[in-house]
Amino acid sequence: MFENRNAELSLKQYQKLVDYWVQSYGVRYFSELTNLGVLMEEVGEVARLLTRMHGDQSFKDRNEEKELGDELADVLFVVTCLANQHGVDLARALQENLDKKTSRDAERHIKNPKLRRESGK
């Protein structure tokens, strides 16, 4: 199941892969409440990294400077676990969510003067 690591994964494939991994290596899913706590921890790690990268604080040491992609992948893994636990098809949910945003915000952001780029910036 892990052989072709260079192939692009669809969301559906990723959900199946995560389920396989949990059943094979994790024994079972953590409870939803535990996964919620783990998700908050992982989002906190992303926030801490981005704060150090773009905010006023520097990294305390070089070992602390983790790759953003790895931290975001941790978030996606836990979100996928929660989706699997609740029978949510992430591909369908994301498409429906994007359709909703497109319908709702079709002109809202374009007309927002705060988002317009000023010349010279």
Predicted regions, residues:
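Flexible "arm" and connector segments at domain edges
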Residues: 1-72, 76-121
